[in-house]
From Swiss-Prot:
Motif interval(s): CAAX motif: 254-257
Protein name listed in UniProt: AN1-type zinc finger protein 2B
Coiled-coil ranges per UniProt: none
One MF annotation (Gene Ontology) recorded for this entry: ubiquitin binding
Cysteine disulfide links: none
The organism's taxonomic lineage, starting at the top: Eukaryota, Metazoa, Chordata, Craniata, Vertebrata
Effect of S233G: Decreased 'Lys-48'-linked polyubiquitin binding
Domain of life, per lineage: Eukaryota
Propeptide cleavage-removed residue intervals: 255-257
Quaternary structure and partners: Binds 'Lys-48'-linked polyubiquitin chains of ubiquitinated proteins. Associates with the proteasome complex; upon exposure to arsenite. Interacts (via VIM motif) with VCP; the interaction is direct. Interacts with BAG6. Interacts with IGF1R (nascent precursor form). Interacts with DERL1, FAF2, NPLOC4 and UFD1; probably through VCP.
Biological role stated in the UniProt entry: Plays a role in protein homeostasis by regulating both the translocation and the ubiquitin-mediated proteasomal degradation of nascent proteins at the endoplasmic reticulum. It is involved in the regulation of signal-mediated translocation of proteins into the endoplasmic reticulum. It also plays a role in the ubiquitin-mediated proteasomal degradation of proteins for which signal-mediated translocation to the endoplasmic reticulum has failed.
Effect of Q230A: Decreased 'Lys-48'-linked polyubiquitin binding
Annotated positions binding Zn(2+) 2: C25, C28, H42, C44
Underlying gene: Zfand2b
Length: 257
């Protein structure tokens, strides 16, 4: 007695057997019998989706877990940068010691990249204030600007210092003493920069630095070029002297009849 509605036929074209306990392929969702349910037996076209391999670190030979869809090379590289226990990886981590302080970033750099606003250290990708959502309030003056301001402050103090000859004698009688008028204090920024803006103060400081700069010492290449030029000029002078001596010692062929 047959039960045509019970079970299912195998999807393999060469089999087509009615199986009362059919099996479903988890890759292609086909129905197969127990003999053809394997990927290789029915030549499954979606078997590559189930071919999951775990990469192994080439330095410490430890399996590295990889998320689905993530390139294995990237996972192995991050493992070498963070968790690898081999000597080359640990030596590399000693060089890259400056960790990015942005939340979620584990990148390390050889040198510090400090934000001018918040003062924290970041990697190359998050060094700009917009990239790491900088919490620093306002715009701080740069180091060059601070140097220019201090230079301008020194110039202002020297230019505004009163000379001894211009000091007025104090009155002898207290009745003639005039009350001092209250002086208005300038804002700290204007007094610090002598009435100049930050850019003007920076330009003034750069001009003074260039004016006070000492003559640069010649490099080794320039010294070699100078010595070669002097040797050539000395050789040329010696050659001309020899030519002049040879002309003076050469006998004349002219004869007077």
């Amino acid at each position: 007695m047959e039960f045509p509605d019970l079970g299912a036929h195998c999807s393999e074209p060469s089999c087509q057997r009615l199986d009362f306990l059919p099996l479903k392929c988890d890759a292609c969702s086909g129905i197969f019998c127990a003999d053809h349910v394997a990927y290789a037996q029915h030549h499954c076209g979606s078997a590559y989706q189930k071919d999951i391999q775990v990469p192994v670190c080439p330095l410490c030979n430890v399996p590295v877990p990889v998320a689905r869809g993530e390139p294995p090379d990237r996972a192995v590289g991050e493992h070498i940068d963070r968790d690898c226990r081999s000597d080359p990886a640990q030596q590399k981590r000693k060089i890259f010691t400056n960790k990015c302080e942005r939340s979620g970033c584990r990148q390390r750099e050889m040198m510090k990249l400090t934000c001018d606003r918040c003062g924290r250290n970041f990697c190359i990708k998050h060094r700009h204030p917009l990239d790491h959502e900088c919490s620093g309030e306002g715009h701080q003056t740069s180091r060059a600007g601070l140097a220019a301001i201090s230079r301008a402050q020194g110039l202002a103090s020297t230019s505004t210092a009163p000379s001894p000859s211009r000091t007025l004698p104090s009155s002898s009688s207290p009745s003639r003493a005039t009350p001092q008028l209250p002086t208005r204090t300038a804002s700290p920024v204007i007094a610090l920069q002598n009435g100049l803006s930050e850019d003007e103060a920076l330009q003034r400081a750069l001009e003074l630095s260039l004016a006070e700069a000492k003559p640069q010492v010649l490099s080794s290449q320039e010294e070699d070029d100078l010595a070669l030029a002097q040797a050539l000029s000395a050789s040329e002078a010696e050659y001309q002297q020899q030519q002049a001596q040879s002309r003076s010692l050469k006998p004349s062929n002219c004869s007077l009849c």
